[in-house]
Amino acid sequence: MRPGAGSESPSDVGCDVLHVDMDAFYASVAVRDRPDLAGQPVIVGGQHRGVVLSASYQARAVGVRSAMPMTRARRLCPRATVLPPDFEALSGVSAAVLEVFRTITPVVEVLSLDEAFLDVSGARRRLGSPAQIADQLRARICDEQSITCSVGVAATKHVAKLASRQAKPDGVVVVPAGEETAFLHPLDVAELWGVGDKTATTLRRLGLNTVGDLAHTPLPILRRALGPALSAHLHDLAWGTDDRIVVPCRGPEEPERSIGADETFSRDTDDPAVVVKELLRLSAKVAGRVRAAQAAGRTVTVKIRFADFTTITRSRTLRDATDVTAEVYQTASDLYLALGLERARIRLVGVRLEGLMDAAKATRQMMFGEREHGWSYADRAVDQAVMRFGRAAVTPATLLDMSRPG
């Protein structure tokens, strides 16, 4: 499925979505600036405590993974060179790569420092087929920044994202329009965008181990296990159905399109219950601010800062934009729990809702167990009570016995 650079590829007709993902970004930038480490196992993160932010492919070959506790990573790869993240260098490379994207197309949706979606439908006449554009991008990024990236080319965002994973490292995978199911169905069910550890466990208990298994399971069975909204969403993705478009990120002159909040604990904590409760409080705060701005957002981002001041973020893009506290919190807590940080000492947590749009233009599906507009109406009732009586008037029961950090 990988076309050669500069070649015509009839298989990419209709495949206007590119997902571009830098390869082992933090580690690649570190090695770029330390040529003596080329080809060696490198881990980026805290020296002793904290977690792995990134690992070179040589370190990954022995099992080192992002978000793994550093003590375990050192046991797996004692020969690895451990380096702290150079956020100034990372930000500079990320900005330069974004400028490369914008010379290709203005329709760029940035997901993080090291990945983005591009809609190249308007660039075909000028630059060639999507597969050719993907090769041009890779060549420019390698020439200008001395790092590699992988590109998935497909008709939809979901398939393009999965294709870029298959392309790693330093490759291009094209999934021809109409051949999505042949690509998707052999994949592990956990590969589906939106399937976290908890959902994957539920699916495996049903004997659903591949995307194809899920696709061929009757919806009523999936609904009983996952609820109506998630089951329908995953069933659509399993059949290659994804109507989400590439949403351009803001330019430098445009207003901020996210709202967030974070909290520093008075003492570092390794108690997941304390972290989850704080995520609930922050989710309520962020969602309230979003509603006050008459907005809604599609991407929930969680920030975790460890005792050694290393920081990681994890994001998930929802099917529909939301301003609902319960949805923000559920996603934020899932992102945190999926990291498995039970023994890591945490100094700060944050929640951010990104990709904001006018709430009047946003649509949303109901959550599992939610009556029509239930959570939305409940949030607005809380907002009215807070406006009238103050923020202490309405507090989630879970927070009543919580010792606030700071």
Describe these PLM feature segments.
Residues 25, 49-51, 307-311, 356-359:
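Short, charged/polar surface micro-motifs in flexible loops or helix N-caps
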Residues 10, 184, 191, 199-346:
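DNA-contacting surface of Y-family translesion DNA polymerases
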Residues 68-76, 106-113, 209, 247-259, ...:
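Short, compositionally biased low-complexity segments
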Residues 111-115, 154-157, 295-299, 344-348:
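Short Gly/Ser/Thr- and Asp/Glu-enriched loop/turn motifs at secondary-structure junctions
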Residues 20, 118, 151, 302-304, ...:
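Preference for bulky hydrophobic residues occupying beta-strand positions
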Residues 320-406:
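Acidic, metal-coordinating catalytic segment for phosphate/diphosphate chemistry
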Residues 116-122, 313-316, 358, 363-366:
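Short, hydrophobic beta-strand segments
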